[in-house]
Amino acid sequence: MDATNNEKADVLKWMLGQIYRAEKRKKQLDERLVRIAEERDAQIGGVGYRPLPRSSSGEGNGAASIILKMSDIEERIYTQKEEVEKAIVRVMDILDYLPQDSLEREICELRHIDMKPWKDIQESIPMSRSQCNKRYNKAIEMLLNKGRIERMIEENEEAYTDWKLDKEWKMLKKSPEKQSGV
């Protein structure tokens, strides 16, 4: 595989990984909602603690702001669930270009739709990890040879580049000591 095909394969793998990324984002939102709900339901202070009475001027909107935050997060979760469903359809559309009963398709479905780790895939098939990987790479190559998939890759190259640059930027921000060689 030459450099151009490697880049196209990377874009294709990124496209196939969209369910995982959407599910990961939804999980983050779910965890945030749980954390805010726990804060809302947590007891205040210790034994015998009584908060001072608040003024009724309407400026103390603590409980209301928590409810608004929760409502906003619930709306984001609903939107993210829709994104997960759309991602599943997009990935299934791509995988439809592989032969119906092929091992390549089964491996790709286990990896990208069911989001199984390689260990589970190799046990499910059953094949060694290296054989599963060879079949997976063969599937990627088969997909790269389809005209419609090639057009989809071209349509997604810019989004992939943006995602990749954003990921690299976050990595650089995380470890400034690595940049300076310290």
Model region roles, listed by residue range:
Residues 1-97, 141, 145-182:
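N-terminal interaction/assembly modules
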Residues 77-81, 120-121, 133:
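Short, contiguous, well-ordered secondary-structure segments
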Residues 87-90, 103-104, 135:
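N-terminal positioning helix adjacent to the helix-turn-helix/winged-helix DNA-binding module
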Residues 97-105:
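Short helix-coil-helix linker/hinge
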Residues 105-106, 130:
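Short, solvent-exposed positions on alpha-helices
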Residues 110-111:
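Short alpha-helical segment immediately N-terminal to, or the first helix within
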Residues 114-131:
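Helix-turn-helix DNA-binding module
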Residues 126-149:
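DNA-recognition helix of helix-turn-helix
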